[in-house]
Curated annotation (Swiss-Prot):
This is UDP-N-acetylmuramate--L-alanine ligase. It is an enzyme of class 6 (ligase). It is found in: Cytoplasm. GO terms for cellular component: cytoplasm. It holds the Pfam family Mur_ligase. The keyword Ligase applies. The lineage of its organism: Bacteria, Pseudomonadati, Pseudomonadota, Alphaproteobacteria, Rhodobacterales.
């Protein structure tokens, strides 16, 4: 057998990405470009991501049509691309290989030893933290992430080292195709159930994910989460390192407190009987400290020293749309966050409470009617850390409305669940009126969601700019 045939050939012809501007697709495209492959793709509109890919040498078409495939030899799609898409149909008609995003990612991973970061929540931040620590430790990893890493200005980078760090997306089950050497599991919650169907299937999916690691690999698991603790009990014939706040975790955070939104803590490496004292993470949130512990477990496994770990955590620059401060006007801080699942929303608002001396005003745009419907009671109860909650219209993401799962249904449900100040808002003008009416210096406005709410958050400081003048003259 020719061993070279088991790796991605260096000459594939033009690789066409349908939806090249997507956060999952663009990272793979960027790494392929950096490896010298001929890359092209299409998206429905231009964006900073597509413009960056063009600067790196990709050909990008705005709009999707069959003619875009001229010269293409391979077509890469995400799970969102279905029959009926003109480029998908044209590829089928021409007999071109159609490759799912995860399959192409898996081929890239075969070129390196790999760390795959899985879990319902925290994947993107944890991937960034692993990359940050390994970068600081001289490992120089290649990284493919599901969010823009502030330190890189991109969701991908090509390193010269032997390791690759990737975000493993469980949404369509294809993360089980990734050939991970080290697999991280942050948590397991019901999400993407349109694919998994049952919680038992979801559990099996994560068991398959960690079971794919080789005998010399490592599973890094958060045993603060009951589902992950159960998963650990099912892992056989593979090494496991646990992390969390609980007393049994191999990598444990202790003495945690917050100063001006900065997490201060020590890390107990219990199997080594070592305490890494005086660690700081320049962002609030117990969930972010937990994510950092996963990165520390990997860094320690790869030989990083305690001082290097401490320095890397202190210099962590974060990820776009993960508790990102987009402005401060008149003493009012505006935060943009991707959180769109009740567990994520609760964690982000708890972090906001830790970071703010004033009140917390939450603004949420529900993402998909199906998610709101299936987790309705959880959504009604996840805003308890916010003093004021405003709910925007549901971002449908192509779905049809579901009875009982609307903006107004959620507001009414929150009030029934005991929230004192929940209301509906219509648009950006309504948001501005709400903030002017409710917010005071020292308060924090947290905009949450996976849809267009990010644009609202980023535009809000300019809309409130006169408040700075009022504060200065007052």
């Amino acid at each position: 057998m020719n061993a070279a045939a088991t790796k991605l050939p260096t000459q594939l012809g033009s690789i066409h990405f349908v939806g090249i501007g997507g956060i999952g697709m663009s990272g793979i495209a960027e790494v392929l470009l950096n490896h010298g492959y001929d890359v092209q793709g299409s998206d429905l509109k231009a964006s900073p991501i597509t413009e960056r890919l063009e600067r790196l040498g990709a050909r990008v078409f705005v709009g999707q049509q069959a003619e875009n495939l001229e010269g293409a030899e391979v077509v890469v799609i995400s799970s969102a691309i279905k029959p009926g898409n003109p480029e998908y149909d044209a590829a089928r008609l021409r007999g071109l290989p159609i490759v799912r995003r995860a399959e192409m990612l898996a081929e890239l991973m075969r070129l390196r030893s790999n760390i795959a970061v899985g879990g319902t929540h925290g994947k993107t931040t944890t991937t960034t933290m692993v990359a940050t620590l390994l970068d600081h430790g001289g490992v120089d990893p290649t990284v493919i992430n599901g969010g823009i890493i502030h330190a890189y200005g991109s969701n991908a980078r090509v390193g010269q080292g032997d390791w690759m760090v990737v975000e493993a997306d469980e949404s369509d089950g294809t993360f089980n195709r990734l050939p991970a050497t080290i697999a991280i599991v942050t948590n397991i919650d019901p999400e993407h159930m349109e694919h998994w169907g049952t919680i038992e299937n979801l559990r099996q999916g994560f068991l398959d994910f960690v079971s794919n690691i080789p005998f010399y690999g490592l599973a890094v698991c958060c045993t603060d989460h009951p589902e992950v603790q159960t998963l650990v009990g099912k892992i056989t014939d593979r090494r496991v390192v646990t992390f969390g706040f609980n007393a049994q975790a191999d990598v444990r955070a202790v003495n945690l407190h917050y100063r001006a939104g900065v997490a201060c803590f020590d890390i107990a490496l219990q199997s080594e009987d070592i305490l890494i004292e005086g660690c700081t993470l320049p962002m609030p949130g117990d969930h972010n400290v937990s994510n950092a512990l996963a990165a520390v477990a990997v860094a320690r496994h790869l030989g990083m020293k305690a001082d290097e770990i401490r320095e890397a955590l202190d210099g962590f620059k974060g990820v776009n749309r993960r508790f990102t401060k987009v402005g401060e006007v008149g003493g009012i801080t505006v935060i943009d966050d991707y959180g769109h699942h009740p567990v994520e929303i609760a964690a982000v608002l708890k972090a906001a409470r830790q970071a703010s001396d004033g009140r917390v005003i939450a603004v949420h745009q529900p993402h998909r009617y199906s998610r709101l419907h299936s987790l309705f009671d959880d959504f009604c109860g996840c805003f308890s850390e916010a003093d004021v909650v405003a709910i925007a219209e549901v971002y449908a993401a192509g779905e049809d409305p579901i009875e009982g799962a609307s903006r107004d249904d959620l507001v009414a449900g929150m009030i029934r669940h005991g929230h004192r100040h929940a209301r509906a808002i219509l648009d950006e003008d309504d948001l501005e009126r709400l903030v002017r009416e409710q917010a005071r210096p020292g308060d924090m406005v947290v905009c949450l969601g996976a849809g267009t709410i990010s644009a609202w958050a980023n535009g809000l400081p300019a809309r409130l700019s006169d408040l700075d003048k009022t504060a200065a003259t007052g």
